[in-house]
């Protein structure tokens, strides 16, 4: 099939993704395993979306496809200490008092906007913790590496809003996690699966390539929609439901193979601190009446995040 004959990403799917990822991705998968952007000119005219499981997973680490890297390989050598598992533990310990203080202040105020009051300042606090622990050389922290790290911290805590949303909507879950903290790890993995930090991983064709029987020319931006795969119902572990107490569901939110997120240890340790402190200090906080969480489905691989999260003390 030629790209021009490929079905487009349905408008109803894109609209649904803003409030219901399960419905949105289901509508996209029903339209076909490979979809093109509806734009016929401009920067999005060469965007293609793979939403089928086989089409996504087969190409996450395909050497034939180019991918954008935030930093060159030579710079990544400097980050070995930062990405070490021990550093993630040290960073989480350094970050915990700040997280506890922010959550305490939020709870004492009776709530507010958790994005503005909790998760956004946490991003700066995490960056400062990296600096205090000297996990990156000063010249790199003040250069390109520091810029990338700062953006990564912001993206991590944009994603953290989904954890707080689920906890605010489900007081019984808060109680379970408080009584059984060993389940917090599974809870974190489930939110990572259901609300991936980046819903699609971008790859770039450098030569004519066939994906899911669709012939793609060179210079196509291929969006591998892991968000669609992780909810596709192909097995009992890939559903729209949050399930804990069985075992962690497999997901590709943090990449795969050579494209696996090297900061994965940090992501998990920091999110664990956030959830532990929240269920201990703010389990009585709930979603503000009448608020309906909505996001804008990104046309690039930008983070899908909640711009606001108004919470109040449970009556």
What are these regions (language model features)?
Residues 1-315:
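Cytochrome P450
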């Amino acid at each position: 099939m030629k790209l021009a004959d490929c079905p487009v990403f349905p408008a109803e799917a894109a609209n649904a993704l803003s409030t219901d990822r399960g419905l949105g991705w289901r509508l996209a998968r029903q339209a076909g395993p490979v979809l093109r952007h509806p734009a016929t000119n401009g920067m999005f005219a060469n965007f293609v979306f793979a939403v089928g499981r086989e089409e996504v997973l087969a190409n996450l680490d395909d050497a034939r496809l180019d991918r954008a890297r935030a930093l060159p390989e030579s710079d990544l050598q400097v980050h070995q200490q930062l990405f070490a598992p021990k550093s993630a533990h040290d960073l989480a310990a350094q970050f915990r008092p700040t997280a506890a203080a922010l959550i305490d202040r939020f709870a004492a105020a009776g709530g507010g906007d958790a994005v503005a009051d909790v998760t956004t300042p946490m991003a700066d606090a995490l960056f400062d913790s990296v600096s205090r622990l000297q996990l990156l050389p000063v010249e790199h922290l003040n250069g390109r590496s520091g810029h990338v790290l700062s953006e990564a911290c912001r993206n991590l805590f944009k994603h953290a809003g989904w954890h707080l949303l689920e906890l605010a909507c489900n007081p019984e879950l808060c109680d379970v996690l408080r009584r059984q903290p060993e389940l917090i790890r599974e809870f974190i993995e489930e939110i990572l699966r259901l609300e991936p930090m980046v819903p699609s991983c971008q790859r770039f064709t450098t030569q004519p390539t066939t994906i899911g029987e669709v012939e793609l020319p060179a210079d196509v931006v291929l969006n591998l929609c892991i968000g669609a795969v992780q909810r596709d119902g192909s097995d009992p572990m890939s559903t729209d439901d949050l399930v804990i107490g069985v075992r962690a569901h497999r997901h590709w939110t943090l990449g795969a193979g050579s494209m696996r997120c090297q900061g994965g240890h940090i992501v998990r340790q920091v999110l664990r601190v956030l959830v532990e402190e929240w269920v201990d200090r703010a389990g009585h906080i709930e979603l503000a009446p009448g608020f309906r969480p909505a996001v804008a489905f990104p046309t690039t691989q930008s983070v899908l995040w909640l711009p606001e999260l108004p919470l109040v003390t449970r009556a």
